[in-house]
């Protein structure tokens, strides 16, 4: 394992002004976000979407700013939806200037500034509804979470436009928080119930180089879970009142593992609690560990990543296997139909993976990042950009959903909007900032993590390395990297070899490269000149995937994967009772291009078996000695799982019986 010093080499963030995505697949998603999703979400935030849950988020800011009368409406964290929308707009403006959109964003920023209190405090719920209760319920009420998202928006808007208006607002907010929290006698010795402020403060430190912001992030992380417990202290001080009663009074205070506050981080051995909170927290910890060269926190990241990725990660890149607390369960407990796998959790997982890659050049993090992106993140949004999943099941039986309340969180189709609408704007900001995930630029090498078509310019010392990636992943196997620099540049390209590809082939200017990979990356060092070409052939045959024997939910079953994509069966192609379909171990696969909503996408077929019975409703519920079903041949059609539920309500499943 590399030492801390070796892994802490300088990492530069890609300037998204210098990167243009032209990928035939994911590029369409960026266009969809820019042209459809951002305007749609702006309408939703202003309550202009028919048959959708009201948001009132913009109205809350107007009320807090004194520009409108009324009462606060929505979740206690409603402000964060506006912040994430602003961040998505910022990254979108890097791709394509839009004067009208920028003007709208500027107006929102002025509204946010008008809602800020003189001392820097910014939160519409407490400003409008409970000004006397500021900073009295950190465990439950998301003040620092909302602050974190607004800080992220301020950083993004500054990086995207050079405008400092929102950056000044969030610096004033961060300065206020720094005055309230810390080790001083007159300060609160607390930390957020929902982590977010930690990763946001690290991003703010990146652009301001203000050491107080890094120190405050460190304080929040180090103080977490210590005794005497802050959540208990503040609970007593406010008269034992609680905001949430989902699982009984004060359940968030009592169940400290829910917020990863049951122990100091250094003592935690398992990924536990609310999945989004976990990955947001660890994103901040990983960023802090690298920049502060803190070996202890680095080891915390490695230990908890390993538990999550090796024992609690779904094949789809989803995390959080139970609806109770939107949380992790125990090792290897990965049910397919009652799973939660929140869209935000997979976005947070990508953020955590990105910071781990910056800390350690190991492709395992990029493999997970890619798995989350191409499956759960893309699956969280319909192909029209106007409907969204909060929860991402691996198996759905729509007929049971209205009657069995264990499935109350599961929806058979994507929704227009949510009362708790954290996921839609989160998906938008992730897709507009994809350029941050493609590369990890280090002083000694440019690491290419994702083979998404783009053109980029990367500073290398006093020179600039320009290159283009072209291809059509995840559908076709060939990726071409072309050097596009006017002057020769001596540098190293580190090419990720995906875990799903058993036999990658690489050529440089037509000559085969046979170098051994190190931790999943192939290193090519040379004097790069304009026109130099590296070609990767990443064969993507259809592969069967089997679960660890300890995952009881997939015993005797198999999943189908091609490239980074997980595939599933849908009722629209295969009829009802998908549980009665079997894929023989000897079956071969054929691929073909889809039509309609599946145009330009690769589908898969195989000859399978349906175990059916005549008029099963007329038969006994249980049979002695002989199964009532007869085996009949049936062609099985598999679609990319991220595309499911784009053709109406129907059954779906990833894991198929293997005969």
Named regions from a protein language model:
Residues 284-311, 334-386, 397:
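Catalytic-core region of carbohydrate-active enzymes that cleave or remodel glycosidic bonds
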Residues 501-525, 544-550:
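Solvent-exposed beta-strand/loop surfaces of large extracellular or lumenal domains
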Residues 23, 30, 42, 86, ...:
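Hydrophobic core segments within long, regular secondary-structure runs in both alpha-
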């Amino acid at each position: 394992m590399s030492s801390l010093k070796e892994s802490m080499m300088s990492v530069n963030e890609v300037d998204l002004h210098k990167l243009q995505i032209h990928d035939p697949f994911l590029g369409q998603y960026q266009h969809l976000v820019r042209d459809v999703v951002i305007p749609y979400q702006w309408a939703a935030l202003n309550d202009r979407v028919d048959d959708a849950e009201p948001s009132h988020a913009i109205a809350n800011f107007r009320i807090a700013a004194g520009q409108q009368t009324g009462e606060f409406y929505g979740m206690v964290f409603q402000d964060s939806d506006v912040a994430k929308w602003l961040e998505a707009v910022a990254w979108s403006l890097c791709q394509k200037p839009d004067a009208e959109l920028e003007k709208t964003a500027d107006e929102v920023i002025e509204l946010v500034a008008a809602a800020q209190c003189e001392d820097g405090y910014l939160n519409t719920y407490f400003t409008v509804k409970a000004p006397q209760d500021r900073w009295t319920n950190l465990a439950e009420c998301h003040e620092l979470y909302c602050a974190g998202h607004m800080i992220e928006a301020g950083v993004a808007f500054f990086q995207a436009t050079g405008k400092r208006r929102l950056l000044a607002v969030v610096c004033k907010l961060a300065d206020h928080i720094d005055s309230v929290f810390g080790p001083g006698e007159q300060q609160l010795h607390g930390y957020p119930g929902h982590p977010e402020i930690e990763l946001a403060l690290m991003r703010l430190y990146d652009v301001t180089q203000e050491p107080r912001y890094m120190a405050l992030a460190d304080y929040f992380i180090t103080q977490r879970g210590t005794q005497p417990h802050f959540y208990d202290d503040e609970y007593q001080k406010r008269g034992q009142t609680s905001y949430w009663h989902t699982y009984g009074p004060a359940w968030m205070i009592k169940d400290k593992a829910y917020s990863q506050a049951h122990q100091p981080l250094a003592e935690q051995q398992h990924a536990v609690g609310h999945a989004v909170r976990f990955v947001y927290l660890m994103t901040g910890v990983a960023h802090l560990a690298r920049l502060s060269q803190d070996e202890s926190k680095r080891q915390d990241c490695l230990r908890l990543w390993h538990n999550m990725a090796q024992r609690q990660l779904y094949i789809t890149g989803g995390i959080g296997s139970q609806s109770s607390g939107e949380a992790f369960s125990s090792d290897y407990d990965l049910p397919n139909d009652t799973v939660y796998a929140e869209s935000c959790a997979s976005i947070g997982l990508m953020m955590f993976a990105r910071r781990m890659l910056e800390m350690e050049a190991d492709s395992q993090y990029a493999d997970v990042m890619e798995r989350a992106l191409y499956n759960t993140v893309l699956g969280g949004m319909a192909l029209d950009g106007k409907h969204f999943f909060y929860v991402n099941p691996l198996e759905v039986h729509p007929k049971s959903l209205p009657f069995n309340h264990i499935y109350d969180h599961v929806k058979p189709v994507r929704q227009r909007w949510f009362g708790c609408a954290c996921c839609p704007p989160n998906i938008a900001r992730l897709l507009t900032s994809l350029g941050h995930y493609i590369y990890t630029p280090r002083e000694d090498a440019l690491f290419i993590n994702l083979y998404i078509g783009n053109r980029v310019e990367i500073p290398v010392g006093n020179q600039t390395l320009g290159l283009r990636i072209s291809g059509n992943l995840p559908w076709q196997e060939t990726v071409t990297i072309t050097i596009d620099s006017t002057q020769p540049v001596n540098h190293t390209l580190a090419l990720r070899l995906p875990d799903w590809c058993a036999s990658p082939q690489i050529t440089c200017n037509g000559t085969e490269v046979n170098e051994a990979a190190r931790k999943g990356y192939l290193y090519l060092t040379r004097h790069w000149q304009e026109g130099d070409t590296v070609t990767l052939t990443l064969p993507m045959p259809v592969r069967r995937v089997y679960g660890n024997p300890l995952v009881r939910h997939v015993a005797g079953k198999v999943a189908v994967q091609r490239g980074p994509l997980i595939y599933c069966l849908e009722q629209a192609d295969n009829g009802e009772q998908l549980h009665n379909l079997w894929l023989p171990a000897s079956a071969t696969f054929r691929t073909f291009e889809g039509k309609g909503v599946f145009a330009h996408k690769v589908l898969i077929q195989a000859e399978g078996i349906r175990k059916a019975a005549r008029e099963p409703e007329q038969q006994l519920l249980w049979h002695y000695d002989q199964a009532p079903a007869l085996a009949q041949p049936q062609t099985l059609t598999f679609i990319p799982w991220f595309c499911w539920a784009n053709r109406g309500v129907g059954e779906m499943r990833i894991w198929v019986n293997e005969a």
